[in-house]
Swiss-Prot record:
Classification via SMART domains: HOX
Regions of compositional bias (Basic and acidic residues) in chain numbering: 9-27
Gene behind this protein: TGIF2LX
Protein name (database record): Homeobox protein TGIF2LX
GO molecular function: DNA binding
Natural source organism: Macaca fascicularis (Crab-eating macaque)
Lineage: Eukaryota, Metazoa, Chordata, Craniata, Vertebrata
Composition-biased stretches (Polar residues): 28-46, 159-172
Name of a matching Pfam family: Homeobox_KN
Annotated keywords: DNA-binding, Homeobox, Nucleus, Transcription, Transcription regulation
Region (Disordered): 1-62, 126-192
An individual GO BP term: regulation of DNA-templated transcription
Subcellular location field: Nucleus
Biological role stated in the UniProt entry: May have a transcription role in testis.
Length: 249
């Protein structure tokens, strides 16, 4: 009788143990789908793996559309000496590129350090301008162009002032002096030609202080007068030769 009583009790305990083991081995059969996902996330967190997101939820951070970048690069190339847009220009670029104002500002901040120096070096300009702000770079460019204008025009003005007295050497003729006759002495001719040079030096000093007041009428072309002087000198030399020949027959 005791063996018969022990038999059913043992079978019950065995069945309970088997059921407990089955529940432990297969927990997914008794749990909901939400619990399954939570268990998977916990397991991934424990192992250090990040669950893969669907493709339509993936976003590329830090990359702008190629068309928008092309528009911004074209604008920077046209305004490379003032390579930072104003607020109105930012709004205009925002409409064209469909980007926000902060995206445009960040792009220009990075592009002025990375893209603009190479762009200016290809054009043969100084890449240091690209590191300055828009207004400062534009002001420095204007100052450099303004400073280069008088530097170029200065020597030309002095050359013109120095070259003018050379053409106006016989200025004394306009003051009433007469052309030397062929029979006059050579010393007198030299004094006549030397006197305008002294006057020219005085006019040269005044013209350096105010070169714009020099009139073109005072410095007319006296090439015909030079021809007359040369002819007179030649005639005087011929007369002297004739006198020497007459004195020594």
């Amino acid at each position: 009788m005791e063996a018969a009583a022990d038999g059913p009790a043992e079978t019950r305990s065995r069945v309970e143990k088997d059921s407990r083991r089955a529940k432990k081995d297969s927990p997914a059969k008794t749990q909901s789908p939400a619990q399954d996902t939570s268990i998977m996330l916990r397991n991934n967190a424990d192992t250090g793996k990040v669950p893969a997101l669907p493709e339509h939820k993936k976003k590329r951070k830090g990359y702008l559309p190629a068309e928008s970048v092309k528009i911004l690069r074209d604008w920077m190339y046209k305004h490379r000496f003032r390579a930072y847009p104003s607020e109105a220009e930012k709004r205009m670029l925002s409409k064209k590129t469909n980007l926000s104002l902060s995206q445009i500002s960040n792009w220009f901040i990075n592009a002025r350090r990375r893209i603009l120096p190479d762009m200016l070096q290809r054009r043969g300009n100084d890449p240091i301008v690209g590191h300055k702000t828009g207004k400062d770079a534009h002001a420095t460019h204007l100052r450099s162009t303004d400073a280069s204008v008088p530097a170029k025009s200065g020597p030309r003005g002095s050359d013109n002032v120095q070259s003018l007295p050379l053409r106006s050497s016989p200025k004394g003729q306009m003051s009433g002096e007469k052309i030397p006759e062929p029979g006059s002495a050579p010393s007198q001719k030299l004094t006549v030609i030397a006197q305008p040079k002294k006057k020219v030096k005085v006019s040269n000093i005044t013209s350096l202080s105010s070169p714009e007041r020099v009139s073109t009428e005072e410095y007319a072309d006296f090439s015909s007068f030079q021809l007359l002087v040369d002819a007179a000198v030649q005639r005087a030399a011929e007369l002297e030769l004739e006198k020497k020949q007459e004195s020594n027959p």
